[in-house]
Amino acid sequence: MARKYPLDKFRNFGIMAHIDAGKTTTTERILFYTGVSHKIGEVHDGEATMDWMVQEQERGITITSAATSCFWKEHELNIIDTPGHVDFTVEVERSLRVLDGAVTVLDAKSGVEPQTETVWRQADKYGVPRMIYVNKMDATGADFFRCIQTVKDRLKANAVPIQIPVGSEQGFKGMVDLIKNVAFIFYDDLGKDMREEAIPAEYADQAEEYRAAMIEAIAETDEELMEKYLEGEELTIEELKAALRKATIANEIYPCICGSSYKNKGVQEMIDGVVDYLPSPLDVPAIKGTTLDGEEDHRNSSDSEPLSALAFKIATDPFVGKLAFTRIYSGVMQSGSYVLNSTKGKKERIGRLVKMHSNSRSEVESLEAGEIGAVIGLKNTTTGDTLCAENSPIILEAMEFPEPVIRVAIEPKTKDAQEKMGMALAKLAEEDPTFKTWTDTETGQTIIAGMGELHLEIIVDRLQREFKVECNVGAPQVAYKETIRSAVKAEAKYAKQSGGKGQYGHAVIEMEPTEGEYVFENAVVGGAIPKEYIPAIDAGIQEASKNGIIAGYNVINFKVKLVHGSYHEVDSSEMAFKIAGSMAFKNAMSKASPVLLEPMMKVEVTVPEEYMGDVIGDINSRRGIMEGMEALNGAQVIRAFVPLSEMFGYATTLRSRTQGRGVYSMVFDHYDEVPKNIQEQIAGSRAK
């Protein structure tokens, strides 16, 4: 079957932003203008098409990354809606992995906010080309130029306006298109009556200044254009657009435009920008992976190559069961066919294939290279798995997810719901890799862990709504970690020889702190320990490191070198060496200056000037480390690093200290050492 749209007419892009910058509204407007939505869904009414889980509609925030296909000027657009709330970083990470480009939505009155920085860094990691859409130009305090300055200052990005606003706040009525050198003025509220006009006289000088800066920025990325520009030749619209497209795809320029999605101004121009400047699947590098033998391999974006696809999200649908959102990188996926899940080494049957429009769907026979759709009927596939042709296996790069930073104990209100709760939690953990659940071996309690209080609230909410399990939830606890500060040598001998077959294992290790993950190195020479026992020592060390010696928390950032040991011809066994490894680790850790680490949150508080002293005093009392302050539209923005353990219940405190006028956001940043006196308190309370 011939393709409906050639590959260069595809745009797989996401819309990313800080919470409340207007991301869902912007997506809704795109769906409205591209003809998929017949009624504009308002977040304020809890009606937005993309926000399809009940919790999202109640809270007015986007949690699940829904993929939607729509069409614009002979292009197929696949939009991945990403949440802006910090607790759902995993959803953003997941979507960025399968996007080719992104639109970063900024709030015109706030500019770059903490979550914008987090998401921007994640996009940098995957090299995703971006354009910037400054939204809410009609709001009080809107300032396009200050907004762009925050991008340059805080994101260190080469933000180049390709539009400037005509008016702002209540008087926002259009924009100057600097490439075409004309103005677009709106004469109605639905954005339908937009007229192309000459640039209003009062904006002529400003437009000339910004157009010259834009042309220079574009010319700097292209030698031929630079020559023409320096010789004083006029650059054509086609030349500017082609060079800007190239520079955007190369992440050399981030084009900036403006609008007000809520007032339907500027959205169509933004969709034009997506088509004009963001990459098609052919513009991004071939997807990399490895063969089953570990050799490097890659696949080009083409229907004729063997199938390779990535399942980037698992969702449970009330009508059809498990849906696996999948990006096809190469080849064609047919419904009813068999594929290999190369990550798990299992064969899977593709039941049905659907293209999603938020939470409605249309069934299709096949998904081709560059497309994003959902697969129904997969039994063993989880987030991040590769699906590929059985006769041409490839494993695409896995996705990385952060470890949870907060945990709570949870129990069903009735004993007979225990099994039901266990199954429900397992299902939710399958959908969300940053959500973990386990049973505490000491207390027998079920523990759930995630990226923040809101994250866990929503999990508990879903247990009740979707799985009909009512739960009692304990107080939140911080996921502390332990580590060491000095290098040591230690040994342990495990010997039991009292008649009959004994046990014997002896290991000598060197342990030192590292920046990265755990590393085990075998440096035993001369066969002091037989090779088959080495993995057992490694396993013993890893098992023991799950319970550090200060307060029983997971130990991180250390390296072990096995340097010597001994064995017994008859009595040695894997179990004996595993125990010896575990004992050696504990001996080493006790001598290696062990310390407790706690998650530090990057906190940003915006308060009216008169409350600033009070709020800073409160942050200091929470062991906060001030990072800086800046004035913003008559308010003060305070930035600090504060331990997560000190932030529980902060929303209530801030409300009462600022009479409800202060707002804050926080995002996990790094682990830091806990002060000695507090370390002793934590260790003491854990020992009780």
Swiss-Prot record:
The free-text function statement in the UniProt record for this protein reads: Catalyzes the GTP-dependent ribosomal translocation step during translation elongation. During this step, the ribosome changes from the pre-translocational (PRE) to the post-translocational (POST) state as the newly formed A-site-bound peptidyl-tRNA and P-site-bound deacylated tRNA move to the P and E sites, respectively. Catalyzes the coordinated movement of the two tRNA molecules, the mRNA and conformational changes in the ribosome.
Q: Which Pfam families match?
A: EF-G_D2, EFG_C, EFG_III, EFG_IV, GTP_EFTU
Classification of source organism: Bacteria, Bacillati, Bacillota, Clostridia, Eubacteriales
Q: Which NCBIfam families did the record assign?
A: EF-G, PRK12740.1-5, small_GTP
What protein name applies here?
A: Elongation factor G
Q: Which GO terms describe its biological process?
A: ribosome disassembly
Give the main location. Answer: cytoplasm
Q: How is this protein annotated for GO cellular component?
A: cytoplasm
Alphabetized Gene3D superfamilies for the sequence: 3.30.230.10, 3.30.70.240, Elongation Factor G (Translational Gtpase), domain 3 (3.30.70.870), P-loop containing nucleotide triphosphate hydrolases (3.40.50.300), Translation factors (2.40.30.10)
Q: Which gene encodes it?
A: fusA
At which positions is GTP bound? 17-24, 81-85, 135-138
Query: Residues in domain tr-type G?
Result: 8-282
The family classification in the record reads:
Belongs to the TRAFAC class translation factor GTPase superfamily. Classic translation factor GTPase family. EF-G/EF-2 subfamily.
